[in-house]
Amino acid sequence: MKSKIKSIDHEVIREILQKHDKRVIFEKTNVVPDESELREELEKVLGLGHVSQKSVLGLDIYQYSSYGEFEQMLIPFLFKTILNTTIDLCIDNHPFIFQNYSREQIEKNFISTGDGGFLIFDTPLHSLLFASNYAIVLRIYNAFHFFPRLRKIIGGISTRYAITYDKVYNYHDNFYGRAIINNARILSRDSLNRCLIDEHVHRWFTVNIDGMENLQVITIDDVSHIQDFSNYSTLPLATGSDKIFGRESSRREGIINSDILKIGKIKAKETDINIYNLHLQVSLSLVNNDDESQKKIVTVSLGNLNTTGI
């Protein structure tokens, strides 16, 4: 079972500094101090080895600054509305996988950037499913099925995606860590509206489902046997259905196509991280909650096939 995000206590660190350091020191002779005792105490408190890995999904509205000032003022509302709708879809469409999440928890683990943001999940599969449902909502908005008059005012919206998997921690109700840093770096380097993932995400899918190409053939039973879901309740498997991973393998709905290609590297500290371009085609059956007689099957692409490097 995934551990909680580690929280760093400001007061604990301050007390250690009061014990092993001085806030200000002015001496006639400058001396480089021995920091070994302070380092040892800080390492015990921070517990770097116990900082859990989390998956971060980065969403960025492409060329937000190119919209008019009036439209720019409306886009944060639109993004928030699409995000809330996506949260509801994920909880409804994937009762087994998202059983440990509520809308409040997902919103709490969201870092807003104004024209997008970062969502923190336990596994890359959570991030991928959220991105897929988001792409569905974005498509019905762009196709004038979701607030069509607002769509006419603002215009079409494009989003670029990034998924990373690394350490994340919490300090003063803010989130930090390499997963967030690398995600922001990937998004800033992409100008082609793709869905990019790092090598840690790629490795997670390779270990757990024998590669991302198998997303189009695995079942919800296969998902339930992934190690990260071993402590999940199996009750949702009996009482509900997953809208992407069926009980039997099918390419009529859910993920009907998946392509993955390595496109380059980014620098992270002293190491290089391989970056992959992911392209999925996802088909979902949607029902209008305001009028359940209205139904529609929507197929979208998450990412694209542009293989230009990063």
Regions found by a protein language model. Give the residues of each.
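Catalytic beta-strand-to-alpha-helix segment of the class III nucleotidyl cyclase homology domain
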Residues: D122-I255
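Catalytic NTP-binding/metal-coordinating core of nucleotidyl cyclase/transferase enzymes
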Residues: H20-N133
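Generic detector of leucine side chains in alpha-helical contexts
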Residues: L17, L38, L42, L46-L48, ...
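Intrinsically disordered, glycine/charged-rich C-terminal tails and inter-domain linkers
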Residues: M1-L42, L192-N193, E199-I310
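Residue-identity detector for glycine
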Residues: G47-G49, G58, G68, G114-G117, ...
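Functionally constrained cores in energy, signaling, and assembly domains
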Residues: T29, P33, K54-G58, N109, ...
